[in-house]
Amino acid sequence: MITSPTYEGVISDIEGIAKVAHVHGIPLIVDSAHGAHLGFGGEFPQNAVRLGADAVIESLHKTLPSFTQTALLHLNSDLISKLRIEKYLGIYETSSPSYILMAGMEVCIRTVKEHGAELFDNYRHELNKFYKNCEDLKRLHVMTGKDLSKEEAFAWDDSKIVIFVRDSSKSGEWLYQELLLKYHLQLEMASGDYALAMTSIMDQEEGYQRLSAALHEIDRELCGAGTAKKQQAMNEKKVRYGNETDGSMENMYEQQVHRGSFIKEVYRPNPQQMQIYEAEEKETAEVSFDEAAGRVSADFIFLYPPGIPLIVPGEAITAEFIERLRTCISLKLNLQGSTDLFAERIKIVYF
């Protein structure tokens, strides 16, 4: 089972992976919750159903005009038993389905079927204009496909607008709040050094223009603050080393304000001390972060969205992991667990 596209729009080589899996008789299940709009035009990559995945889950409500909680499960081959799927749907599905939600799904599907060509053509036109307008940003950076190598992404879904902050004193959460409180623009999520805006076929030119204008205004403000910071750094160097400066001063400054990959750092794997089920069967205790270093986690801790665990029960709580938690807290990211993490409390296996 793989996720494609990811929250940020990274798409895997579904066709290639499916071929390898099928050689070994293994079905490929694709969590394509954020890819319901793929394959209908607009120059977007093809969807996983047409690329040979055996089961594909798509959330209509994430990228198409449909109510929250509406999704589709596509069964695409005989490698997955339809009877088995029906069995588990009977166990987990509600016995009181919402006819409003189901009717909304039908309207969504009919809209795409009857008006999809026009809607997706306009969608592509507006996205292209937006990305072109944002090419001149200096302290902010709107990600494009050129930022990703083939090793990082087979393809990319640019309906996800990923906006990076290049100023080390600002975070993705800061940008998220700035756009919300000052410009009344609601983004989807924030991470360490970027924020994510979701778009759909229903977005109009006005929305893209408002976001572009807001980003340019914020960018100008950051450039002004950055110039003052740069001058201060240069003055401090002159005081310390005299008036001679070398050509690397600009690069030194840029390195100071540009953080490395926050995601790679915060999701660094933790050493496993025991299986999850073993940790959950043992006694637990709630302790401070400082007391927890060197102990074993008894909790799932994750950033939401997207909800990928930073640590799970049975993994070692290292001093480095505690520092990563403190970094998330300092950036005001949505850190979740069963304890009050913002009060620096964490649940450990007690033995």
Positions of the model-derived regions?
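Conserved C-terminal alpha-helix-loop-beta "cap" of PLP-dependent enzymes
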Residues: 135-231, 237, 246, 253-316, ...
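Terminal helix/beta-alpha structural elements that buttress the NAD(P)+-binding lobe
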Residues: 338-351
